[in-house]
Amino acid sequence: AGARVYRRYNHQQVGKGYALDYLFKCLSASGKDVYDGYFVFDADNYVDPNFVREMNNTFDGGHYAALTSYRNSKNFGANWISAGYGLWFLREARFLNFPRMLLGTNCAISGTGFLVSGEVIREKGGWPFHLLTEDIEFSVNCAIDGKVIGYCDKAVIYDEQPVDFKQSW
């Protein structure tokens, strides 16, 4: 086991979108971009032991540009702020993405806990989504391009939520 770390030192182009773009371009330049898909997580996420299997089962079942998962809260009961965030992500999963998946319409990725198709990364030449809300930018781009984002309700990640307003901004 082990990990390969790609260090990036760019103080002008900051943010997750630029970091993902840099990583995918490094993988491509070194000939390591032959994967079916790539998972995107935040460093503080806890990934359910069945996550990869469930996402893979859904990914294999259709031609998806990306898949999103159920984003649960690690600290739902900490206070009303963290609980509010937890309820927001529950609403997003159960009342937006789950029904859309059942109806065969487009879902949306949201921040963390998603799988993006290697084919899409290769077509785009990396991750050209650099807005602060790069997840929304990607989701809209998929809709414009006629690419489908799916949802896997059995794949769960646990994400730590802010406990005060300063953290949430």
Predicted feature locations:
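Long helical/loop segments within the catalytic core of UDP-sugar-dependent glycosyltransferases
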Residues: 7-32, 50-132, 169
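A short, conserved beta-strand element in the Rossmann-like catalytic core
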Residues: 14, 45-47, 72-75, 137, ...
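Short beta-strand-to-loop acidic/aromatic patch adjacent to the donor-nucleotide binding site
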Residues: 32-46
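Short, Asp-centered acidic motifs that coordinate Mg2+ and/or phosphate
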Residues: 37, 65-66, 149
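Hydrophobic/aromatic residue at the end of a short beta strand that borders the catalytic acidic motif
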Residues: 41, 47-51, 116, 138
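Catalytic donor-sugar/metal-binding loop of nucleotide-sugar-dependent glycosyltransferases
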Residues: 130, 139-157
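Active-site donor/metal-binding and catalytic loop motifs
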Residues: 153-168
